[in-house]
Amino acid sequence: MLVLAAALAAAGIVPAASPAAAANVPVGSGSYSDTRPAGTSGPTTNTGTPVTPKVTEAAKGKPVPTNDWWSSLAFQRYGDNPYSTPMYGHPLTYQAVSGGLEVGYPTSPAIVGDGRQYEYAHKRDLTLGLSGLNSADTKADSWSDWTVTPYWSDGSRTLRTTIGHGMPFVYAKGSGGDARITTAATPTVFADQGNVLGITVAGHHYALFAPSGSDWNVSGSTITAGLGGKDYFSLAVLPSTDALATYRKYAYSFVTGSTTDWSYSGGIVRATYTLTTEAKEGTERGTLQALYRHQWLHTSDPLTSYTYVSPRGTMKVRESASFSTAQKSSAVLPGLPKSSGVDTARLRTYLNEVANSSDPFSSAADTYWTGKALGKLSQLVPLADQIGETAVRDKLLGLLKGRLQEWFTAGGASEFSYDSAWKTLTGYPASYGSDTELNDHHFHYGYYVYAAAIVAQYDQAWAANSAWGGMVKTLVRDTANPSRTDGSFPFLRGFDVYAGHSWASGHQGFAAGNNQESSSESTNLSAALVLWGSATGDNSLRDLGTYLLTTESESIAQYWFDADEQVFPSSFGHDTVGMVWGSGGAYSTWWTANPEEIHGINVLPVTGGSLHLGGEKAAIRRNLTEMERENGGPAQEWRDILWEFQSLADPAAAKSKWDAGNASYTPEAGESKAHTYHWINTLDTLGAPDATVTGDIPTSAVFTKGTTRTYAAHNYGSSARTVTFSDGKSLTVPARSTATGSGTGGDPDPDPDPPTGNTFQLRSGGALTTATGGTAGSDTIASGGGANHDGTPYQPLVYEVRGVNGTYASGASTAFRLQVDAGTTVGLGQQARVSYDLTGDGSFDRVETYQYFATDPVTGWEEYAQSRGLRSATGSLGKMTGGTVRLEVWNAIGNGASKLQTGTDKSVLVIPYS
C-alpha cells in the first residue's frame, strides 16, 4: 500500500504544502487549485462559520479522518458543542462532555419515525472522567484504523481515553485527579475486589479497573479511585457477570492502535485485523474484541461464547489481538458480455439516441450530477464496442475525456481545489455538502474514476500519470487513500474498515451517529478502483478495490438488506433500509419517502460492479415485494433501476416487465434505455450472476441459467491469458477483450447436488446438507443472559438450506435429533424452531417451535429431539419448489452458553418430504 503513495509522489502527484505555493498546482496534463474559487466555502459549522480540525498540538498538521464513526470529535459542526455528538463504536456508545466520556450500551431497540426507523440510541450508563475535570472542549489526540483517542484538559487535569469499534474496554490515562466514574443511576455492586469493581447500571454489567494497590470507593452514583502515582485505569462492559475474571485478565493490556491488512489472490480476499497493545501491569498483551456479523461469518478463528447486542446484530467475542477473514471476491466486469439475446439494430438505435443528444450531460454543473452523467455515458462505451459501433464508441469516449479534462484543469468554471487545513480535495461547483460538510466525496468521485477507467481501457496514453492519470489518482487519494503515511490525505477517508462499509457525512454530527444512504454509490467507487487498477496495471489499487467491494458487499447484504433476517429487530416492519446509521437503520432517504427511491438508492448506478448484489436472490425478492406493497403497485418512476435489480435474481421476470413497459418510461437520470435493454436481455440470456464460483482475476464473473453456467472475463493485458475458475473450469481470453464461454476442463459438475433425501446434517457456518462425511465439530449457543426466551429466538444459531424441491408426505411431520451439551452450567434449556419457505420468496409458510430441552450440568452430549413436543406452529406445509428450510437453536432459559454438535449423523433435521 505504501508503494502506491510513493509512486504517486514520484510522479509529482503531491498537493501544495502551503498557501504560499502556486495557485494552480500542475499534475501531469491537469491541475488543481490550492485556493477555493471566489464566493465558495470550505468546512463550516451549521451556521456557516469556517472551522478547522479540532485536534491537539500532537495531531496538528496530520490528515484528519473525516467521514468516520467518531469524526465529530475533530469536526465541530455546532458552535455550542465543542465536545462531540454521540459516537457509535459498538458494542459501546460514547459522547464527549466537559467532565469526560459518557459510555452506554444500548440493548433494546426503539422503533421511531412512524415505524420507519429502528435505533439503539446512545443513552448514558456512566461517565468516565477525573475528579474535578471541567474541560472547555474535547479534541482528537491520535487515531488509527478504527480507534481514536479523545483528549480533555482544564489546565489542572488532563484525560485521554482510547475507544474503538468492537472494543468492550475503554482505556484511560489521566493526571491531576482521581479516577472518577459517575453512573446514571445508583449502581448495584456485584463484585468488589479492591482495585477491581463489578457494577450493574440499567441492567448492564461493567467492570472498573484501577491500578494494583488502589481501591474503588462507591458513594451513591459516584465511584472514585486514587491512582497511587500511576496514570491509568480502564473499564469494560461485560456480557455477563461471570465474565469478570476473563476481562480482568486483559484490563491492563491497553490498546494503542489498530491496523487492517488485506490481500487478493486467486479469487479470495483475505484481511487481518490487528490491535497493538502495551502492558500497563504484568506481561499480558492480548485483548478481547467483538466481531460484527459480516466478520464472524467469514472467519475460521476460534471465538468465545461471549456475545453483545448491536444495531448490526449479534457481535461475537474473540480472545486475541487479531483475527482474519476470507471471502470469495465480488465479480466486476467493465460491462456485461455480448449475448444472443441483444438485438444489434435495436441497441444501435438506443446508443445513437444518447450519443447524438443535444445535451448528453443533461446540463450537469456540480460534482454529483456531472458524475451521474459521466456514469451514464461510460456504461455505453463497452456496449458500442461490443457491436462494432466504433464511431459511437469513440464519440462517447470523446465526451468523457472532454468533460473529465475540464474538471481536471484548474481555473475554469469547474475545478478541484485542495484544502491544506482539512487535507482534502473538493470539486467546485460542489453539492450536497461536499464542500461545507465534506460529505459524499466517495459518491461523487467514484463516477469520475469509473469514467476514467473506461477511457483507460481504450486509451492507455490518456491514463498515464504524465497525462490525465495523475489527477485521477489524486481523486483516489482523497476518497480511498491506501497509505497511512501520506501527509496530504487521510487513510481511506470514507471507508470504515471495521464497520465494513463507508460513511457519508464528513462531520458525523448527528444524535444517531454517522450514516450512509447509497451503499451502491460507495461500491461504485470500489468497482472503479478495480477497473482503473486493472486498466493501468496498478495491482495495488486493483486489489484495494477488490477488498473494499467484497467487504462492503457483505455489509450491504446484512445491514441494508438483512439478507439472513438476523439483524433488523423483529419489531421493525421493513425488509430493507434506505439508510444505515450508527444507531440503526431507516426506511427512508434524505430527499423523499417514495418507496421506489428508498429501495432503488442502494442499487444505482447499475454497472458491471453491481453483480455482487445477485448473491442474495431471496433478499432481492423480499425487497421488491415490499417495494410494491409500500408503493401500492409496481414501480413508476425508477422502473429501470428496479427492473435491473430484479434481473439479478429473476431475469425472466425482469424481461417481462421491460417488454411490457419499455416504450412508456423515462430513464432514471444516470441510466439510459441502451444500457437497461442490454443489461436485462443479457441476463435473461446468460442467467443471473452466480456468486458461488469465482475467477482468478477480479474482472471475471459467472452466470447460471438453469443448469448451464457461462463464464466471462475481461483481459486488460497485451497478450491472451487463461482465467481459471474455482470450479476448475478455464476460459481463454484474448488480449484487451472480454470473452465468454462454457469453460473447459474442470469438474463437469463442480458443485454437485448432494445426495437426495430428506435428512440434513448441520454444518458449522450455518448450512444444512444432505451430504454425509462431514467433519465433527460444534457451535456455541449464546447465553440467554438469565432471561426467559421460551418461544422467542434469542441470538440463535441458524442453519439453512435453499433451493429445496420436494413433495409433502401427507400425515408426516418434522423430526430432529440434536446433540447438545451445557457442560457444568446449571439450569440451561435449548430450544429449536424449524421454518419452511415453500417457494423461496423470503416468506416462511410454516413455522414450528418446539418445547425446550433442559440439559443437565454434566459434561457430555445429550440428545434433544422433536419428541419434546410442539410449543407452537403456524401455517401449513405443501409442495416445495425452490424452497428454503431453516433451523434455529437458542438457549431459552438460563445464564450460560452451551454447545450444539455439527458435522455428524447424530445431529440431523428430517423434513416430511420426498
Predicted regions and their residues:
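Ser/Thr/Gly/Pro-rich low-complexity, disordered linker/stalk segments of secreted
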Residues: 744-756
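Proprotein-processing/basic-patch segments
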Residues: 754-813, 817-828, 879-914
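Conserved aromatic beta-strand anchor motif in extracellular beta-sandwich/beta-rich domains
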Residues: 832-838
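Ser/Thr/Asn(+Pro)-rich, low-complexity disordered segments
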Residues: 23-442, 482, 486-495, 533-536, ...
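Aromatic-rich carbohydrate-recognition surfaces in CAZymes
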Residues: 364-384, 435-473, 518-526
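Short, surface-exposed tryptophan/glycine-enriched loops
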Residues: 512-515, 853-894
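Acidic, glycine-anchored loop motifs typical of Ca2+
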Residues: 779-780, 840-842
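Secretory targeting and sorting signals
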Residues: 1-22
